[in-house]
Amino acid sequence: MSEKPLIWLGDSRETIRAFADDVRKIAGFQLWRVQRGLEPNDWKPMPSVGLGVQEIRIHTGTEHRVLYVAKFAEAVYVLHAFEKRTRRMPQDDLHVARQRLRLLINQRARRKG
């Protein structure tokens, strides 16, 4: 099975690098699964962000989320990562993910010309 490359949008890579070691390792392993065409162990679709966007859910005493889109053949795009501090999805984080997805879709459309 071929492995899709990861493309990090915005500060998503730096954010994951700043997570605690255990969280970072879990996030890395789950993204590796996605690159191989497998589902993460704990995920849910995020249609409120956009079609095909999914959320990796990481539970380690604190809650962390990684939002990505893997529906494109060329790569897995990591849209956003954050620590979730409330039960509800923070609107600021949803906004960031939507904005990055919109930029990605526009860039892909320009490349196809």
Label the predicted regions.
Residues 1-63, 72-76, 83-113:
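Basic, Lys/Arg-enriched alpha-helical interface segments
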Residues 67:
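Short, surface-exposed charged micro-motifs
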